[in-house]
Amino acid sequence: MLKLEMMLVVLLILPLFYFDAGGQVVQRDWRSDGLARYLQRGDRDVRECNINTPGSSWGKCCLTRMCGPMCCARSGCTCVYHWRRGHGCSCPG
């Protein structure tokens, strides 16, 4: 009977490590990397947008709800997801 009780305790406690205090699934690096790759496929990640930066003549925005109306300041930039920092622009050089 002791083995059965121990097995039940382990089965009840083990799933708790996959959730944080708020009941949300804990996000690991591999999930955010997958999201970043998803955002950068095809034309999902960028589009031409209205420029809202004074003195700038160019910008790109994310097409996803998560990025909203964010514009990158230079050409060649793409919207990427940085784990724990959220979405932002990734610009060459």
From Swiss-Prot:
Alphabetical keyword list: Acetylcholine receptor inhibiting toxin, Disulfide bond, Gamma-carboxyglutamic acid, Hydroxylation, Ion channel impairing toxin, Neurotoxin, Postsynaptic neurotoxin, Secreted, Signal, Toxin
GO molecular function (one): acetylcholine receptor inhibitor activity
Propeptide: 24-45
Presence of the UniProt keyword Disulfide bond in the record: yes
This protein's domain notes: The cysteine framework is XX (C-CC-C-CC-C-C-C-C). Displays a mini-granulin fold, a structure composed of two short, stacked beta-hairpins connected by two parallel disulfide bonds. This newly described fold is derived from the same cysteine connectivity as knottins (ICK fold). The name 'mini-granulin fold' comes from the structural homology with the N-terminal region of the human granulin.
Role according to the record: Alpha-conotoxins act on postsynaptic membranes, they bind to the nicotinic acetylcholine receptors (nAChR) and thus inhibit them. Through its two C-terminal domains, this homodimeric protein would bind to two nAChR allosteric sites, located outside the nAChR C-loop of the principal binding face and at the adjacent binding interface in a clockwise direction. This toxin specifically blocks mammalian neuronal nAChR of the alpha-7/CHRNA7, alpha-3-beta-2/CHRNA3-CHRNB2 and alpha-4-beta-2/CHRNA4-CHRNB2 subtypes.
Protein family: Belongs to the conotoxin D superfamily.
Protein name: Alpha-conotoxin-like Ms20.1
Annotated source species: Conus mustelinus (Weasel cone)
Lineage: Eukaryota, Metazoa, Spiralia, Lophotrochozoa, Mollusca
